[in-house]
């Protein structure tokens, strides 16, 4: 056996076992320590070249230089819109949700005031530094509301108005480090890509984490099993929400010890978390004494304070932090999102307004589409009401409106481009009630379009 070992050679350089310090065996192959060192040198050179190309990239140079304090912040304090101005802009884009819009306006205004305050403190002369200067901490925001109530739209509208980098992340794809799925640092990579890889600009942006309720702890007992997509993700997000220097892989994916990472300071990034939190109303009502377990008697019902009884749609207005803990969010996570805005469930009247009032309302969108075919589209007020009623029945919020109108307009959008003699079209309530079973009657050129509605 010893004679056989003496003839072992490196499969790469062909040196025998006696000529090298170490010979590592694999499945049918061998490699010596010298070849391993050579491979490491090759990998290091490749990493250096990659980093040099990244630093010289035109995308990085397109934005403002990082080392210039006068231009590193997108705007000065004097140009930041006041909360009333922010809410006015939100009113033009989002219908309803007055309380949530007011909370967002104040929170965003204070956030950028804090950024400007920090910039002024950093630019002070070293001789005049005040060790007792007040440090302003950021306040992340939690949006709670049913699906289709406008959580994502509010965040996107804010980013559009403030003209800062804005990224949307999905919490359902995140897992704890070491498991299949995305690391939490990939959220910052999306913000970097929106900033064209400008770190300084990304550090002043906004990140909206959607479906945050899906990372709630699966059980109230944290010791039952390891929850890598629930509590584990909450633990991983703690430092990022509070403010830390995060290492982000420039190509995404998992971090590798031999790959260079981009460092981002998250203390200046505003995080907005949103979720539907289905079932949270029941937790609030149970705390208020609305529900009881098992059979009840008249004497039991008399013990319930009638003043505390609330409708299920208004239960979230009485939300407390303990309710979120019972839902599955850990206290440390809740403590890093101090601002909480509860969005109202959309009513039929609100859905009608959403169809017609905003700048990008669905009715205006389809009117614009048909105007490109030289057709004037009109909606009867009763038809708008019928569409809103159908959307309210589907219980998916404003998202149901587009689905209904797309279904309503499908046949019309298919036939109208080929009928050049028709110049006007009106959507009626009967068309909606009859599930869009309308027929178009052709008329002589130059006449208006008439809708023949089947019974």
Curated annotation (Swiss-Prot):
Residues annotated to bind ATP: 146-153
GO molecular function, one term: ATP binding
GO biological-process terms attached to the record: cell division; proteolysis involved in protein catabolic process
PROSITE patterns attached to this UniProt entry: CLPX_ZB (PS51902)
InterPro entries, per the entry: AAA+_ATPase, ATP-dep_Clp_protease_ClpX, ATPase_AAA_core, Clp_ATPase_C, Clp_protease_ATP-bd_su_ClpX, ClpX_bact, P-loop_NTPase, Znf_CppX_C4
Annotated Zn(2+) binding sites: 10, 13, 32, 35
Alphabetical keyword list: ATP-binding, Chaperone, Metal-binding, Nucleotide-binding, Zinc
Domain ClpX-type ZB as annotated: residue spans: 1-51
One GO location term (cellular component): HslUV protease complex
Its job: ATP-dependent specificity component of the Clp protease. It directs the protease to specific substrates. Can perform chaperone functions in the absence of ClpP.
Subunit structure and binding partners: Component of the ClpX-ClpP complex. Forms a hexameric ring that, in the presence of ATP, binds to fourteen ClpP subunits assembled into a disk-like structure with a central cavity, resembling the structure of eukaryotic proteasomes.
Membership in a protein family: Belongs to the ClpX chaperone family.
Protein's UniProt name: ATP-dependent Clp protease ATP-binding subunit ClpX
Native organism taxonomy: Bacteria, Bacillati, Cyanobacteriota, Cyanophyceae, Synechococcales
Name of the gene: clpX
């Amino acid at each position: 056996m010893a004679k056989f070992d003496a003839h072992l050679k490196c499969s790469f350089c062909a040196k025998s076992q006696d000529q090298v310090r170490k010979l590592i065996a694999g499945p049918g192959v061998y490699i010596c320590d010298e070849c391993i060192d050579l491979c490491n040198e090759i990998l290091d050179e490749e990493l250096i070249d990659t980093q040099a190309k990244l630093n010289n990239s035109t995308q990085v140079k397109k934005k403002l230089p990082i080392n210039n304090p006068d231009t590193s912040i997108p705007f000065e304090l004097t140009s930041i819109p006041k909360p009333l101005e922010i809410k006015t802009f939100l009113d033009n884009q989002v219908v309803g949700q007055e309380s949530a819009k007011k909370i967002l306006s104040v929170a965003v205004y204070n956030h950028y005031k804090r950024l400007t305050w920090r910039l002024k403190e950093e630019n002070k002369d070293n001789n005049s530094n005040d060790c007792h200067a007040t440090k302003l901490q950021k306040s992340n925001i939690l949006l709670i509301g049913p699906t289709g109530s406008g959580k994502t739209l509010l965040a996107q509208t804010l980013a559009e108005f403030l003209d800062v980098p804005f990224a949307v992340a999905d919490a359902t794809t995140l897992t704890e480090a070491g498991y299949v799925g995305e690391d939490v640092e990939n959220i910052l990579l999306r913000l970097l890509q929106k900033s064209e890889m400008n770190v300084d600009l990304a550090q002043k942006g906004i990140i909206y984490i959607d479906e945050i309720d899906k990372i709630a702890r699966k059980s109230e007992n944290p010791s039952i099993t390891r929850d890598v997509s629930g509590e584990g993700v909450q633990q991983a997000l703690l430092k990022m929400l509070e403010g830390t220097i995060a290492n982000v892989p420039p190509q995404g994916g998992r971090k590798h010890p031999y790959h260079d990472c981009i460092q981002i300071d998250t203390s200046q990034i505003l995080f907005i978390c949103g979720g539907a939190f289905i079932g949270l109303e029941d937790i609030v009502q149970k705390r208020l004494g609305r529900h009881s377990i098992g059979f009840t008697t008249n004497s039991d019902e008399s013990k319930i304070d009638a003043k505390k009884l609330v409708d299920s749609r208004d239960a979230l207005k009485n939300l407390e932090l303990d309710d979120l803990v019972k839902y599955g969010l850990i206290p440390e996570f809740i403590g890093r999102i101090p601002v909480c805005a509860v969005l109202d469930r959309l009513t039929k009247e609100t859905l009608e307004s959403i169809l017609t009032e905003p700048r990008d309302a669905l009715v205006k969108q389809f009117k614009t589409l048909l105007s490109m075919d030289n057709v004037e589209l009109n909606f009867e007020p009763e038809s708008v009401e019928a569409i809103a009623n159908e959307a309210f029945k589907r219980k998916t919020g404003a998202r149901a409106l587009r689905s209904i109108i797309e279904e309503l307009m499908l046949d019309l959008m298919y036939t109208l481009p080929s009928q050049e003699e028709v110049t006007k079209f009106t959507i009626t309530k009967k068309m909606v009630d009859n599930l869009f079973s309308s027929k178009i009657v052709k008329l002589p050129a130059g006449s208006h379009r008439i809708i023949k509605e089947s019974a």
